[in-house]
């Protein structure tokens, strides 16, 4: 995984609580790739979080709060997923998903 890139959205630069857009590439470590159980972990991780989150893999970008969308990515072991998070708490939320990828979503 790499360091996140940070973008302040132009229309929000002057607000006290800035909305950030952070991106980082995460590697799928699970032998079976992202299947139903890891997809469920991802969706639960984002449940209630004040963010927009997207995964990009193989040229497809999806809403990462949708289990069906995550499954349709078909990301295999070793797949590099670009994670994009837009939130006032983007750094904290990105760290949570990076930790989940690092642990193989609890399967390693």
From Swiss-Prot:
Domain of life: Bacteria
Domain HPr: 21-108
One of the GO BP terms on file: phosphoenolpyruvate-dependent sugar phosphotransferase system
CDD domains per record: PTS-HPr_like (cd00367)
Pfam assignment, any one: PTS-HPr
InterPro entries in alphabetical order: HPr (IPR050399), HPr-like (IPR000032), HPr-like_sf (IPR035895), PTS_HPr_Ser_P_site (IPR002114)
Role according to the record: General (non sugar-specific) component of the phosphoenolpyruvate-dependent sugar phosphotransferase system (sugar PTS). This major carbohydrate active-transport system catalyzes the phosphorylation of incoming sugar substrates concomitantly with their translocation across the cell membrane. The phosphoryl group from phosphoenolpyruvate (PEP) is transferred to the phosphoryl carrier protein HPr by enzyme I. Phospho-HPr then transfers it to the PTS EIIA domain.
Name of this chain's protein: Phosphocarrier protein HPr
Species the sequence originates in: Chlamydia pneumoniae
């Amino acid at each position: 995984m790499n360091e996140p890139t940070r973008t302040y959205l132009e229309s929000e630069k002057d607000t006290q609580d800035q909305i950030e857009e952070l991106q980082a590439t995460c590697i799928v470590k699970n032998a079976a790739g992202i299947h139903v159980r890891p997809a469920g972990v991802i969706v639960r991780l984002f449940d209630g979080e004040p963010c927009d989150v997207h995964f990009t893999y193989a040229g497809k970008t999806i809403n990462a709060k949708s289990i069906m969308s995550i499954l349709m990515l078909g990301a295999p072991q070793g797949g590099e997923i670009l994670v994009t998070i837009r939130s006032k708490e983007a750094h904290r939320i990105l760290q949570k998903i990076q930790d989940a990828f690092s642990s193989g979503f609890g399967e390693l």
